[in-house]
Structures are given as C-alpha cells and as structure tokens.
C-alpha cells in the first residue's frame, strides 16, 4: 500500500482502494446498475475487478444504427459466453436499427442467454420495419419476465411453452393474427401480470385473453383503426385496468372475473363503459375517469356493488353527477368517495341541473366516512348543491376535504363559509379546506 504525507499537517494519507474492500455481493449489485459496456471497462481498475464483471447477474446492451453491427454482435456473444454467474438474472437489448432489423441474428444471442438460465428478457426494437420475434425462443424453462417493445411482430403458429413466465409486457408490438394471441397466452400457464399497450394492430379482430392464472391485467389502446372485441376470461384476476378504447364499434367483454378486487376504467367509449361496468360486481376499489363517456342519460345498472368501499370519480364531461348518483345508489357499503373535478365552470352548462335523488342512498346513511373533492370550484349551483347534499345526508362522515382551486381571497372566504354553514348529518364530521 502506497503512503503519502500531507504537506500541511504531516499526516499520512493512504491510496487504499476502498471500493474494492466492499463485499462482492454489494459490488455486483452496483455493477448491475451500469450498462454492460461500462462494467467491462471498469474491470481494468483493479486486479480484483478483472473477472468480477463475469459474475454480474444483469446485462444491458445498446445498439445504434451508426455503430458496427458485426462488432456489436461479437461483443454481446462474447459477454454471454463469458458469463459465469449461477444464472443470468436479466438481459436488456435496446436496438435502434434505422433500417431492416433482420440483418441481426437475435435468435443466436437470445438462445445463448436462455442457455444461461435467463430469468428476465427486455427487448426494445426501433426500426423502419417490423422485427419478427423468433418462434424458437417461445420455449424456456426459466424465463419469468418477458418485455417486448415497439417494432416487434409476434407470429405464434403453435402453442408456446413458457411455463415459468409470470410477467408479460407487450408495448406497441403487433400480432400476425388472432391465433397468435391465443397461442402465446395459452403457453403461459403461470402468468400473473399482463400489460398490453397497443398503438396499432390491424391484424387482430378478436383479442382473447384467457389465462386462468392471471391476477393483474392492464389494457391500454391508443389507436383508432378497426378492432372488434377484447374478450377477457380470467377467473383469478384481482386487478383490472382498461384505458383508451374509445371507438364505439369496439367493445370489451369480461366473461369471468369472480375474484376481481380493484378496477380502473379510463377514457373508454360509452359502449365499452356500459359493457365493463356490469362485470365489476365483486370490486372493492373502483376508479372511473369519464372524459369520453357519454353520461347524459345513463341506463340503470342491473347489479349492485355490494363489495365496493372505495370510489374515485374523475370528471371531464357535463352532467358527470349522473354517474355519481348512479354509483351512490348502487354501492350501499361505500366508505370512501373521492371526486377529481377537472371541468371548469366555463365548460359546464348552467341549464343542466343536478336532480337530487328521490331517496337518500344507503351508503350515505350508513357507511360513508371519507369524502374528498379535488379542484372544487364552487361557482356553479350544481356542484355547490351536490357538496351540500352529501354533507347534509352522510350520517357517518368523519372527514370532508375540499381542495379549492386558486381564487381571490374574498371568494374563497365566501365559499368556505357557505360549506361551513351546512347543517351536517354527522356531528363528528371534520371539514378541511386546502
């Protein structure tokens, strides 16, 4: 160990490599946070580090189309062959081809990774053409997480075998046909979490999600081409998020979700909204964002939400209170109600009146304890009367919070005073203004 002496104080200073003294497990964890190219580069810093990079459990590679593709493929293959950890925890390939992605043989690289008992594969492809994911790679004993992004074409002519796969994320990929969807999901017998984020897919007419083991499902759609039906048959599902299915000729059929506990429905068409709402009888927590739902004249709901205790309603449309009234009437055990009012007074129509229910909803009389209104404007009679109605009738209410948008101080004092003057049904109700 080299020793130097400080000129100012005469104390000895050490050039000791303190990082190398860290436990190997911690060093590997630190190295896992770096791109693999940098991990290999730092191996020259100390003798102990020379071979440590070969034990790093996670590898990440970036390719840009201006780089030498042949050299890139060679370096990735070399790293994979040199890998000495008990198994490969994750492999991230971020590829920007700018041209035809078929010029690179992914099958060999990913096949080597599978031979290292790969647990997680993340593949992101940016290209002017679609990259067809190799069918031979749909069979793995160890893969637990598969994330495919962007210009990837999925063609599965036969059922796959991904028996350890628990998380599948499909982001802006495209399927060849309906059968490819069915065959891919049918081979994922342990799948628990599925995320589908589509921006274009002209080939699939019926997107069938039939996975007995699935517990969490997120479907986000951001395109407007023809697309017939989403069919969901997931008897173990506990969480559901549906967003962006806004074209009226599209629908979503939820056939079997008896275990569903939480759901979030965002920006869907009226047809989809009507279809989904009747399938949520078992949910305990529900979030509704109704910016695109036609809620001027909602039909009656046949089922009652006996298990629903938590409701969030985000408002963007005139007459949104019709939906609120409907949900209050059909949720007898509701305990928490949160309103996010993103609609300004300029957007509302003063002639559209809120009609007080003929009978006070059971949830207000017996169960509602928490009421939150975010972005409360208090300018229109409708929202003022609705807020007063809840305060006057919620007998078990413990806390009512109003987040008031920025207004002049005098108007704020007047608004707060008006709500404070309401004779509350609950003597223990605390009013909070923020």
From Swiss-Prot:
InterPro entries tied to this protein: F-box-like_dom_sf (IPR036047), F-box_dom (IPR001810), FBD (IPR006566), FBL13/AtMIF1-like (IPR050232), LRR_dom_sf (IPR032675), LRR_FXL15/At3g58940/PEG3-like (IPR055411)
Disulfide bonds: none
Residues covered by the FBD domain: 353-403
Keyword terms of this UniProt record: Leucine-rich repeat, Repeat
LRR repeats: from-to residues: 69-95, 100-125, 145-172, 173-198, 219-244, 265-290, 315-341
Gene3D superfamilies: 1.20.1280.50, Ribonuclease Inhibitor
F-box domain location: 16-65
Protein name in the entry: F-box/FBD/LRR-repeat protein At3g26920
UniProt organism field: Arabidopsis thaliana
